[in-house]
Amino acid sequence: MSFVCGGSWKFQSGCLEELTEFAKHQFALNRQHPDGSTERDHLESVERQTGRRPSALDGPPLPYDIAHVWLWFNDLSAARGNNGWGPNALNYQDMAAWMMLTGTIVRPQEISAILMLDRLWMSEQAKATAAARKAKG
């Protein structure tokens, strides 16, 4: 898949790849441990205690040209439903309602990017759930 980068609506794969790498790093930092804390919490605690910033806190930068897609994804994700077994994936109906309520105009390529981010997020949630089950025995 490709995405816009560099202020042009010509699609370039590098920009979406940068967003993907940024998102993977953020999702990994936000992964919850069985005690309810996140990986980010643990690393920031190390930083506070030692005065040294763990390199794992510093990941790829958010690509400026498509930062809005990341913000939109987070906005949609914060309102996602739950089916009793875990979080629901975002869907077109969720996005259509969000666009209508916020007045946001989203291009088809941006919708694809949001759905790609959601697949990554759901995958990270599945890993966290599996780790929690394994920790419980």
Per-range role (PLM):
Residues 1-137:
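An amphipathic, hydrophobic-aromatic interaction surface with interspersed Lys/Arg
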